[in-house]
């Protein structure tokens, strides 16, 4: 009976450990899939906001206090064959939305810039058909 109890205890511990590893794996891969900001906006720009674009990538909004400009770049999680990508960036206090980048890209779209010191910005777009949209953010 002692051997049976010991075998059951080992099986329970092994099963719990395997279940814990399996439960942790999806979270670990989801975190690992988020791509880091690539510095495409240039020196002096710091990330002030970001949003995941489904499982396709991440859009990063950056700001330079020296220039008063915001910059937007969308980066794919996995670079590869070109896919359609479009990003827009505008001041929230205007109806003019002519600052954009659009094309088929292997790794990222942008950077695009708008002078927005003292006002909010709107930024939106898509990566391979998956849309993101942020309105009236990062005011100031």
Residue spans for each PLM region:
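N-terminal prepro-regions of secreted/extracellular proteins
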Residues: 1-46
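Post-signal peptide N-terminal regions of Sec-secreted extracellular proteins
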Residues: 29-140
